[in-house]
Swiss-Prot record:
NCBIfam families cross-referenced by the UniProt entry: S15_bact
Gene Ontology MF, one: rRNA binding
Job description of the protein: One of the primary rRNA binding proteins, it binds directly to 16S rRNA where it helps nucleate assembly of the platform of the 30S subunit by binding and bridging several RNA helices of the 16S rRNA.
Any one Gene Ontology cellular component term annotated for this protein: cytosolic small ribosomal subunit
Keywords: Ribonucleoprotein, Ribosomal protein, RNA-binding, rRNA-binding
Protein name: Small ribosomal subunit protein uS15
Gene name, Swiss-Prot/TrEMBL: rpsO
């Protein structure tokens, strides 16, 4: 369950801070959020898929750590990203 190249490029263009930005926390969080959304949909169709469930938990933890990092370094970007991605908090 991975995102295709086109989807990643689209997300990167939408959330990048400058033209060549591909790895900022904003971009990573946006890509993880899309991946989490896809995994949630997969688990609705296949509720017994335990490997995907564990992968989902791992991705959510990774996103949480990145969000905590972004909040501690640049609170304004954090709040902006939360609203753009429609995440709770």
């Amino acid at each position: 369950m991975s995102l295709d190249k086109g989807t990643k490029e689209e997300i990167t263009k939408k959330f990048q801070l400058h033209e060549k930005d591909t790895g900022s926390a904003d971009v990573q969080i946006a890509i993880l959020t899309e991946h989490i959304t896809e995994l949630k949909q997969h688990l609705k169709r296949s509720p017994k898929d335990q490997n995907s469930r564990l992968a989902l938990l791992k991705l959510v933890g990774q996103r949480r750590k990145l969000l905590e990092y972004l909040n501690s370094t640049d609170t304004e970007r954090y709040k902006n990203l939360i609203t753009r991605l429609n995440l709770r908090k």
